[in-house]
Amino acid sequence: FDPSYITKSGKFTHGIGYFYSGCSGKYERGLEIGNFSVIDVKQNTAYHLLATQSKYVKREKSTDDTLMDQYVELLKLTCKTILSISGVLVVDAYFCKNKYITACKDLGIECITRLRDDANLRYKYNGPTKTGKGRRKLYGEKVYFDRLDKRKFNLVHKNSEMKIYTCIANSISLKCDIRVAYVEFLDAKGNIKLTKKFMSTNLDRDGLSIVQYYRARYQMEFVFRDAKQYTGLEHCQARDEEKLNYHFNASLTSVNIAKGIARKGVKKDEEINISISDIKIELSNRLLLDLFISNYGIDPNLQKNRKIYNELLNFGKNAA
């Protein structure tokens, strides 16, 4: 799941307000859609599932209906569809909040996300217990990521790009135990250039798959990019809620159809390079060629025509 900012002018469009734009790094006037996508990890690509327009909530207005409440409500409405496809939901660090993580756990959905840089965690206590009255000790000392205790974090993956350490810890802000994947990204010399922390609500999840699933989430951004560039995601002039909803979902679904065309004849679990621009060019070429063939009475089944026909279908493509 990921929200996306949609540029839109006017005063009377449903839901228009100020939303965060990742491109400009600030709040801008326009619309926002909350989008669920299905990520095929083997194909390394995303397919649109559902887009719902967000309601604008003034930040200075005292109300219980925050944007996060809308995201939680949308999750509840969509959970049956999500669980019918996969039990794993991947979101970015913005959603690493108690309200959203708790909703995922209550709905039986495993949530994978990135922890904040200042995440406050504590180790689970596994030492000897005292006899006598009182509750047994549950938690140990605080987790200091700047001087990580690698006796408690296990190294589960290592290559030339990164090292992944994992541990079960308790999050004070999320009020639950989580599986933590601590990643050290390495430069060409093998020195640590960057560290990031990821988590899963599934305590049995391995650290490597947490990182792989989170990195696969970025395929959603390509769906937004392709829809904005090639299928008119931001070109709707309607102001009505239903018309806008239809347009957003139709535009994003068009990207799915284009990917389906590109993958025709390709094995289900095979990764390929897909250019939506090339697919649009091929479909336009096919339309014009069929028009010429129909009007000029050309037989496309002749051997020499079949070769030329296929060459002209690829005319103007950019991808190799």
Describe these PLM feature segments.
Residues 22-86, 177-197, 201:
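Electropositive, glycine- and tryptophan-enriched low-complexity nucleic-acid-binding patches
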Residues 1-45, 160-163, 168:
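Active-site-proximal, Lys/Arg-enriched surface segment
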Residues 56-184, 265-274, 306-310:
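An internal, acidic/charged active-site-proximal segment
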Residues 273, 277-320:
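Long, low-complexity C-terminal extensions of enzymes
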Residues 235-291:
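Basic, amphipathic alpha-helical segments enriched in Lys/Arg and hydrophobic/aromatic residues
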Residues 1, 5, 143, 207-238:
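Short amphipathic alpha-helical "interface-anchor" segments enriched in bulky aromatics
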Residues 1-11, 77, 106, 112, ...:
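Electropositive nucleic-acid engagement tracts
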Residues 1-9, 36, 88-96, 111, ...:
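Short, conserved catalytic/metal-binding motifs centered on acidic residues
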